[in-house]
From Swiss-Prot:
Lung and liver. GO terms for molecular function: chromatin binding; DNA-binding transcription activator activity, RNA polymerase II-specific; RNA polymerase II cis-regulatory region sequence-specific DNA binding. This is ETS domain-containing protein Elk-4. SMART domains: ETS. It comes from Mus musculus. There is a cross-link at K166 (Glycyl lysine isopeptide (Lys-Gly) (interchain with G-Cter in SUMO2)). The gene is Elk4.
């Protein structure tokens, strides 16, 4: 027997064989039949399909598939009783089953196609659909249409693709090589100039440092709102001089060489007639006196004659400086024999607070003094009482009383370098 037979065809075959009447039999002439020995029929169906564990439960579930296909239906109220939906037409399928059993495959295919056409014209019975589908599929596969179509399409498409790839690949490679060759040179030309411009602004800043003085008032006003306690550290003395001209208010903690390099460019014009300072530093600072003169803003016109006299006198004889301007974060005692001992590397710094001196550089030019006073006035809780706020940014603030006095004086707010307080009220007179 053929294992490709369907379940409804197997049942119809058993009904047509008289030796199987003890297992299955017709109950009426309208296509009803009953399974007398349901388990035996299920066992035979399992042998046909090579499923030894077949039973009636599985067989009944398989019959439900034909309920949907409208081939077999269950008779209500009767156990093991089923019915072929279109019984007269279902008998025409007997030659198919017999042909399958005998092995006449060619006759089977022809009969299936003819029966499927008859069923389609009838419109009621659909049993031959599975057979018709298989036969039509087999006919389509064995015919030359399927194979010739796919092979021809693949051959033509492959030839075209291979030709196009062989022609286009060298051109694409050449185009990519040409496009990639100029790129390294372009990158080199772009990157090599980019490394040099950072050096140019430093030289330009040195060249144009005197021209920055007219905009000092605007820079002070901008720094009042934008200044912060922590700014990037200054690495070279040249950057410190630039910041002094632009009134940068917060010089951070410099390294140890910075206080040693500052004295040559920080001697101030004499403002009083009190010679109390050693002459060693004056001889060292005689050469770079021109830079503070160029960097000073408004006091240049007022005290221009005094630095010139100092220059002439320094060449002939040693003359002691007359005044010393200090930042608000310094304490000078009267017992110190040399007030400028802090500037020489060999002399001890016993007259100063070491922490304050390491964090606050000494600026002897008038313009950095104004900037530092103005900056500390912005941080002070008594900002309206600070001298820079009272006299404004247009006029240069000086301390004649402090510079002319010989006695020791202290500045308030020396507890920490970050929060210095304002000057005492007596310092604001005149």
């Amino acid at each position: 027997m053929d294992s490709a037979i369907t379940l409804w065809q197997f049942l119809l075959q058993l009904l047509q064989e008289p030796q199987n009447e003890h297992m299955i039999c017709w109950t009426s002439n309208n296509g009803e039949f009953k399974l007398l020995q349901a388990e035996e029929v299920a066992r035979l169906w399992g042998i046909r399909k090579n499923k030894p564990n077949m039973n009636y439960d599985k067989l009944s579930r398989a019959l439900r598939y034909y309920y949907v296909k409208n081939i077999i239906k269950k008779v209500n109220g009767q156990k093991f009783v089923y019915k072929f939906v279109s019984y007269p037409e279902i008998l025409k399928m007997d030659p198919l089953t017999v042909g399958r059993i005998e092995g006449d495959c060619e006759a089977l295919n022809s009969i299936e196609t003819s029966s499927s056409k008859d069923v389609e014209y009838g419109g009621k019975e659909r049993p031959p659909q599975p057979g018709a589908k298989t036969s039509s599929r087999n006919d389509y596969i064995h015919s030359g249409l399927y194979s010739s179509f796919t092979l021809n399409s693949l051959n033509t498409s492959n030839k075209k693709l291979f030709k196009s790839i062989k022609i286009e690949n060298p051109a694409e490679k050449l185009a990519e090589k040409k496009a990639q060759e100029p790129t390294p040179s372009v990158i080199k030309f772009v990157t090599t100039p980019a490394k040099k411009p950072p050096i140019e602004p430093v030289a330009a800043a040195f060249a144009t440092s005197p021209s920055l003085s007219p905009s000092s008032e605007e820079t002070i006003q901008a720094l009042e709102t934008l200044v912060s306690p922590t700014l990037p550290s200054l690495e070279t003395p040249a950057s410190i001089s630039i910041l002094a001209t632009t009134f940068n208010p917060t010089p951070p903690v410099p390294s140890t060489p910075l206080p040693l390099k500052e004295p040559p460019r920080t001697p101030s014009p004499p403002l009083s007639s009190n010679p109390d300072i050693d002459t060693d530093i004056e001889s060292v600072a005689s050469q770079p006196m021109e830079l503070p003169e160029n960097l000073s803003l408004e006091p240049k016109n007022e005290d221009s004659a005094l630095p010139e006299k100092d220059k002439t006198n320094n060449s002939s004889r040693s003359k002691k400086p007359k005044g010393l301007e200090l930042t608000p974060a310094l304490v000078v005692t009267g017992s110190d024999p040399s007030p400028l001992g802090i500037l020489s590397p060999s002399l001890p710094t016993a007259s100063l607070t070491p922490a304050l001196f390491s964090q606050t550089p000494i600026l002897l030019t008038p313009s950095p003094l104004l900037s530092s006073i103005h900056f500390w006035s912005t941080l002070s809780p008594f900002a309206p009482l600070s001298p820079a706020r009272l006299q404004g940014a247009n006029t240069l603030f000086q301390f004649p009383s402090v510079l002319n006095s010989h006695g020791p004086f202290t500045l308030s707010g020396l507890d920490g370098p970050s929060t210095p307080g304002p000057f005492s009220p007596d310092l604001q007179k005149t």
